[in-house]
Amino acid sequence: MIDSQPVGGGDVNQAFKLTTTDHQQYFLLMHPSDSKNFYQQEIVGLQLLGQTAKVPQVLANGMWGADAYLLLSYIASQPFGDQYALGRGVGKIHKRTSQNGQFGFNVDDPEGRTTDGGVWYPDWQSFFINERLEVRKRIIMNRHLWTGAMDARYQKAVAHFKALMKTHHSTPSLLHGDFWSGNFMFDENAQPVIIDPTVFYGDREFDIGVTQVFAGFDNEFYQGYQDEYPLDDGYQERLPFYQLYYLMLHLGKFGMEYQGSVKRLLRSLA
């Protein structure tokens, strides 16, 4: 190796672009951990998504001193690319479903974005409420950022979600699980590359709802998705509940700056 250059690795990992003496380039993620399996969830996710979409190739993982590491192929990127192709690609991913016909996943996410692996439910409504919303709520309560007024609106929002789900059939699709604009990029040919997954099997509207929380997806993305795998009637009413989950995740992780957004969304859903 002749060069190690720090690059953005998200809010959890240290990340480096490595260049070797023969000019090969690699992407290295590192995180303090006592387990060589720290990145197992991401590895499995990349392997699953890579059967349908372009993703970084997993080259090696293990321990380096007191840090877990994950070595990936390096993909040169550019800021703009084919969002229509991105939408179609996500639609193709969502067409893949769980082998057992249930909702969940079987590998832990050590970064805390999801629940423990090995949790499966026969219905999406119960999985989403128990393993997503309620988990986030407990974390927020432990940080003393959950008020009585928020809880009253939350209970009404959950009842509203249950009512909407009575007329919607959920299929356990393969999901990225954390699909905001920081988790895709475009290669040198302007083609989409999917990164940093937290995969599980769930209703595909979950991923689409998350895309709408922060900027980064344009109309071409949604058109591409609809052309590949049209969303079911009434999806506009259901997407805000997945936005609520994602904002609750950020409130529990990053603190007070997201409380106002959660409160406003709860008011609109109650």
Regions found by a protein language model. Name each.
Residues 241-250:
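Short helix/strand-capping connector loops at secondary-structure junctions
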Residues 53, 94-101, 140, 165, ...:
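A general structural signal marking secondary-structure boundaries and capping sites
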Residues 5-126:
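ATP-binding pocket architecture of kinase catalytic cores
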Residues 1-3:
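Juxta-kinase regulatory segment immediately upstream of eukaryotic protein kinase catalytic domains
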Residues 33-34, 63-66, 75-77, 133, ...:
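Short, solvent-exposed loop/turn segments at secondary-structure junctions
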Residues 250-270:
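ATP/Mg2+ or Mg2+-diphosphate-binding catalytic cores
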Residues 117-129, 138, 171-174, 181, ...:
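Active-site Asp-x-Gly
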